[in-house]
């Protein structure tokens, strides 16, 4: 028999940006807990609104499965005499297991006991399971309230717990569980009784609550599509939509209007004012330009929607008026004055001002630009972009709208007559801003972004501010990922070690003990990105710390090894095994010995040497041209000669000349891939 389980945690309003993760974690925790308790169920779902987390388990078994455990004891010959009389060993084993000697089972000449743990009633178990879910739920942040020694994302105000029609009774943080929930906080005053889990959703609908976040999302989109028939295309950005869904319990979309004169402001200013500050969706005309409309979503029904529209229009009008004021004030300040203001902003304690950072960026972009063979005119543009890169940090607009850093730098640069390439680089220096964000698309933007990020990383490492575990307050991992992704995306021939060395040169730290740790950190981020691209872990390990540390070179080598393995896994493993055996033997040699064909005695070593001479130059030529797969495929030619040599030739003979000659040959064979991969890192058993 089975019943449905309904568990609702009613709270004060939770932060919308955290609800999705909490919902996912609650589902995982519930599933794992029920499975650990041996409770069968058909389906587990978790819903949420700003004021509730809802766990709904379909067809949860009324009783645990019984647990059977077989415990192995002493050998039969030790447990029993020849006549079957139990020994002290048998009695001790049975006593330790809580059974009688007669309950012992003899199988395969050993004594066993089968222990059966009867399943408990689910209703009784739930009295501990449900409060346990609250206590164990991982939360990004939590709070205490009243005088309870208990923390949760927000204060708990009610608990609904039903197993079928049975109330699961428990108390937590001064709240007693029961069969009651609450409807919309502004539309329903009285608490609502729920008879059973199936009854819950009807009760919620009558209480103006759409519990299912997916249905709220669909409803908002449907309402927006209706509004679009009147005002034009609505810009629905997915992250904003997700946030709005988690801000409301009963969504009703509406549109409003603002004065067309505000369209003179940069689009990003308008969009930020609407989306970031008011959670409105912008609207665009047929030509893709912003129109003087917005779409908002209220938490409630359509009653008094005109008053709601008017109120929101007034709020946005004030916000846009402020933005226009800040914009106009910023235009009154010259570039030279901005530069002076940067001297007053501390970049990082012990690392000088933001102006000091700008000076470092100017030096870094020169180093990077020269390594990429840029022309003098290009270098001058890069220097100009670096010089202006932080000016917008001291503007009124960025002070009010922090997410517009870079955006306003670009806008003000264009207004001041700077080249578009320079202005775009100022904006692109901050890309990517988060995982999955777009990368810089211009050469100057890529270089400035790399320079800014490597300077940030080296600066913080020099002060001992190094990411550890989940702690990364300065987002250094994200910035390192950005460097690697930019280099790979644009196929820039840049080595991570070069970037590190250049950043150290311009920073001039007193102590350089952090250098190796920072290099390892950068390589670890490269490893993460290779893993995200589907490269096997062992192949990543085999290529990352071999050869130069140009991410493109490393990626090319990794992909070549992956391709070779994928084409013929068995042949690949056999080849690597042979090369590893050759290298292991070669490591027993002392010093560097040249190969002398006159010392060959066996057909197998002559054949191996002949094939080595035949393919060596071609392999090196392909590797030099970075045609790694072609070079590795050529390496397959040595597989059979290597196997024949290792199977039939004794290497460690008494004659030192012959022994060293054979070791030298094996060393040369194993060196064929030394600049491409470390063969010892390849896993041969999976």
UniProtKB/Swiss-Prot annotation:
Domain of life (superkingdom): Bacteria
Keywords: Aminoacyl-tRNA synthetase, ATP-binding, Cytoplasm, Ligase, Nucleotide-binding, Protein biosynthesis
Catalytic activity: tRNA(Gly) + glycine + ATP = glycyl-tRNA(Gly) + AMP + diphosphate
GO molecular function: arginine-tRNA ligase activity; ATP binding; glycine-tRNA ligase activity
Compartment(s) of residence: Cytoplasm
EC number of this enzyme: 6.1.1.14
Primary location recorded for the protein, binned into one broad class: cytoplasm
Enzyme class: ligase
Cited InterPro entries: DALR_anticod-bd (IPR008909), Gly-tRNA-synth_bsu (IPR015944), Gly-tRNA-synth_heterodimer (IPR006194)
Pfam families in the record: DALR_1, tRNA_synt_2f
HAMAP family reported for this sequence: Gly_tRNA_synth_beta
Family (UniProt): Belongs to the class-II aminoacyl-tRNA synthetase family.
Protein name, per record: Glycine--tRNA ligase beta subunit
Species for this entry: Halothermothrix orenii (strain H 168 / OCM 544 / DSM 9562)
Gene: glyS
